[in-house]
Amino acid sequence: PKFMLNEGAPVVQAPSIGPKTAKRLEAVGVKTIADLLALNAELGEQQIDARHISAKVIRDWQAQALLACTVPGMKSREAQALVACGIEDAADLAESDPTHLCEGVAQWGLSDEGQRAWGTAPAPTGDDVATWIERAKRAIQEGKANVAA
């Protein structure tokens, strides 16, 4: 599978970022995925000055975008689920236990945030999660799990 996101893509294509948030980010110079990955989260929180956009939220967006840029076939909702489970990059994913991670993703899927992100898509199976882990391992082996953040 191909990468679902690249560094040159507009920031609105990042997981969790819709048109309104993209406009807020663009107003502080964050126009692309590369800009998002390079953003200092604390500084971004101050510059954006919106109560719901904290440094932690920005770091979550960065981790989601990084996963979508470095793990082939990683969909936005999958990246959101993984970051909610504490997975921040391909290395974290590659070292994960599929059964444990599948349980975490399922729990998150029951939350309001999870239901918004996942929508009507079927919940990932243990096989799906194992596939994500294998793709992360392969990307690392092939040297593709690095972006110029």
Residue locations for each model-derived region?
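C-terminal extensions
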Residues: 1-149
